[in-house]
Structures are given as C-alpha cells and as structure tokens.
Amino acid sequence: MEWHSKFSGPNTSPGFLLWQATQSWQRKVGKALAEFDLTHVQFVLLTSCKYMIAHGETVTQKKLASFSQTNIMMVSEVVRTLEKKGFIERSKNPQDKREVLLSLTEIGGEKVTAALPIVEKIDQAFFAAAMKKENFLSGLQELLKHE
C-alpha cells in the first residue's frame, strides 16, 4: 500500500500533533474534574458562565456558545445536564420571553471556585515547555482568528 502525504510522518503533521496533545491534556483535566462531578465540557461552560457574569454580562445559551466557541445544540444539552445537577439555573428573560437566561447556583459557583485552581495547575504543568516558546500563545490565538 502506498502512502502519500505532504508530511514525512505523523510527528511532522501539525494537525496530528495538535490532536495528540489535545487528547493528552483532556485526559489529565478529565481525571481531575471527575472528583467534582464535572466533565471537561461541563467545566468549561460552567466556568465561562461564571466569568461572563463576573464581568457584567447577561448570559444566554447563545452568548455562552459564542464565548466558548462551541455548538449551540451541544451547549443546550450540557446546560440541561448542569441544571439537573443543580449547578445552573435557567430563567426567562423578563425583557424578552423567548430568551432564556443562565445563572450559576451557589453550588455551581463553588464547583468553579474549587476546580479552577486545579485545572489551572494542570494547564501550567502541561503547557510549561511550550510556553517557553516565544510565539506559543500568539500562535494559538492566530489559529482561532481564522475559524
């Protein structure tokens, strides 16, 4: 069987390397978040919601999806799960009855407060070598501009 690729192998393919790094990082974060009864995606959306509220934003599922750059349908499903767990509350917007507002419950806020430092510690350890490279963060930011 012949092999044709622009790259000499998997270790020179940026997409494959990013995939592997992402999988490794997500495994570490997922393992740490299990003790908080959160998946990685639940943590990201819950933390994003808390961040947005702390910065004076009214949070809707649409705004949360945009902020976290995730699919609105996935956000809807995850928010439903977070609501069942008692971490998020949904309510109708008094100014626009079609719009659903999101807020954290006390326990949801406590989950973020407890889990965030642990996830940040994992991030610091996992990305330490790459952060020494001058353009690592700006390179990631540049990738997100072209979506």
Swiss-Prot record:
SUPFAM superfamilies linked: Winged helix' DNA-binding domain
Pfam family, one: MarR
Domain HTH marR-type: residue ranges: 11-147
Gene Ontology biological process: regulation of DNA-templated transcription; response to stress
Disulfide bond annotation, renumbered to this chain: none
GO molecular function: DNA binding; DNA-binding transcription factor activity
Keywords, in A-Z order: DNA-binding, Transcription, Transcription regulation
DNA-binding region extent: 61-84
SMART domains: HTH_MARR
UniProt-recorded name of the protein: Uncharacterized HTH-type transcriptional regulator YdcH
